[in-house]
Amino acid sequence: MVVTVRAPATSANLGSGFDVFGVALSKPADVVRVERADTTTITVTGAGAQYVPTDPQENTAGVVAAALDAPATIHINKGVRPSSGLGSSAASAAAATVALAELYDRPLDDDALVRAAAQGEAAASGVAHADNVAPAILGGFTIVREDGIEHVDASLALAVCLPETTVSTRDARGVVPESAAMEAVVSTVESAATLTLGMCENDPQRVGRGVEDALVTPARARLMDGYEAASAAARDAGATGVTISGSGPGVVAVCRRRDRKRVAAALVDGFDSAGVAASAYQTRIGDGATRLAADGDDRAP
């Protein structure tokens, strides 16, 4: 028996929801194919495959297989570029979790699936955190709590930009303030509440206002040449809000569907004005991990 699952790219933090908020993107995605075996082996193809470890102890899908006691021959077709800030390792972990649970007939509930996938994330980041794997499994908008996951089946237009630069996760974590003035805390709580309401109502204006934060994004923006120019250009083109995706360097802009193409182009132009090459694409908040038909195409979209 072979099980094939597609799991999407994700954007975590969303400005005001540091380590808490996440959304699934309709594209790109990883596609993971699993088959029972005595020991786990991993092969990887697709975007940035050369940067993805195939040692099961170092690969997120391999760690998931060990956590579930579900050895398998695992093939990962990467659609989510590693080190993009779009949850590349989480996409593989999420797809592997859903696929292996199906392969071994393990009826796990959503929280258990997310917990298992988060263990895989520890192979990539050193921390079993769920802000990317939760939306990769459940889709829509998710809120990660210590005792569970809140989920909203949101659907909003987005533009995503990938500048040709790198941001170390260690550096991105290192610049996050350890303390903050009460005024900044109140402002961030206000934004987080506004964003959550906006997701519940599929309101791009509220979500756009809600991604603004006074704590994490300003600190991380200093690590990204061209971010301020790209953010300003996107807003001029109709974006209701712009923020760094995860620890970067990916950038996500909230917008109305009619403005999405123009916003994507503006993000590229903004980075270009600062001497940074970039590419961008149009997407939306989308579905989570999905099993593909047995004879389906396992190419990563």
Swiss-Prot record:
Pathway: Amino-acid biosynthesis; L-threonine biosynthesis; L-threonine from L-aspartate: step 4/5. GO terms for cellular component: cytoplasm. Belongs to the GHMP kinase family. Homoserine kinase subfamily. GO terms for biological process: threonine biosynthetic process. It comes from Halobacterium salinarum (strain ATCC 700922 / JCM 11081 / NRC-1) (Halobacterium halobium). Its EC number is 2.7.1.39. Its main location: cytoplasm. Pfam families: GHMP_kinases_C, GHMP_kinases_N. GO terms for molecular function: ATP binding; homoserine kinase activity. The gene is thrB. This is Homoserine kinase. It is found in: Cytoplasm. The keyword Glycoprotein does not apply. Keywords: Amino-acid biosynthesis, ATP-binding, Cytoplasm, Kinase, Nucleotide-binding, Threonine biosynthesis, Transferase. It catalyses: L-homoserine + ATP = O-phospho-L-homoserine + ADP + H(+). Catalyzes the ATP-dependent phosphorylation of L-homoserine to L-homoserine phosphate. It is an enzyme of class 2 (transferase). ATP binds at R81, P82, S83, S84, G85, L86, G87, S88, S89, A90, A91. HAMAP family: Homoser_kinase.
